[in-house]
Amino acid sequence: MSSYDNHQALAGLTLGKSTDYRDTYDASLLQGVPRSLNRDPLGLHADNLPFHGADIWTLYELSWLNGKGLPQVAVGHVELPDTSVNLVESKSFKLYLNSFNQTRFASWQDVAETLTRDLSACAQGEVKVALYRLDELEGQPIAHLHGACIDDQDIEIDNYQFSTDYLQGAASGKIVEETLVSHLLKSNCLITHQPDWGSVQIQYRGAKIDREQLLRYLVSFRHHNEFHEQCVERIFNDILRFCQPESLSVYARYTRRGGLDINPWRSNGDFSPATGRLARQ
């Protein structure tokens, strides 16, 4: 359980509440959640973050009307910088996108500019938006996260409560540079406690991290309640704190919900995330 799940900043969210679905444009549907909510307990401050990164969203259910009333469809790619004041709450994002459905826009550029303006205002940061026609994405192969998968270990687990204890003494010995991947990440929505399923890629240079301890740590998120972005920052912070690598990058790709998937990454080095969708996305 997070220490801030009853914070007043969450009280006004539509998440977990019955809502009306509007199909005409309404920017007020967007709701932001302060990033400071989970960063403050971790000792992370906006003016001295130990990482850089972004939250990459894929919008699969995006439709509007053109100037003549003909429906248009697109796949959207959105990037929120980790330096934005707020993250965007996903249910509000879905409701906001639904409000485009019966709204006429003069051009695709008009749609992209509207999304950029509204999301930047909600996040209080510079958001990037790109729209893709379906024929631009047809034939796109299923991607995979590069690295050594740590999931097929013959270990017994009977505790699924979140704990950083699994990382105690996890790094020792010679300096290595490696990339590890797990598809067993499961956390739960901070408000509704619905399951969030993801794959995580951890790239680091430093003392070798024990793979069993790392996997036990990741599995301990199974009953943990936080938003996707917050989980990635927690993983980054915990590995940095306990394993003290020289460089570290953490990237998670979560399965979609409500036509949206969220793929946050954080790094203190040179890292360029692969943006192709995975098998479960």
UniProtKB/Swiss-Prot annotation:
UniProt-recorded Gene Ontology molecular function terms: preQ1 synthase activity
Gene: queF
Organism, as annotated: Klebsiella pneumoniae (strain 342)
Active site: C189 (thioimide intermediate), D196 (proton donor)
InterPro entries according to UniProt: GTP-CH-I_C/QueF (IPR043133), NADPH_dep_7-cyano-7-deazaG_red (IPR050084), QueF (IPR029500), QueF_N (IPR029139), QueF_type2 (IPR016428)
Main location: cytoplasm
Full protein name: NADPH-dependent 7-cyano-7-deazaguanine reductase
One matching Pfam family: QueF_N
Annotated compartments: Cytoplasm
Lineage start: Bacteria, Pseudomonadati, Pseudomonadota, Gammaproteobacteria, Enterobacterales
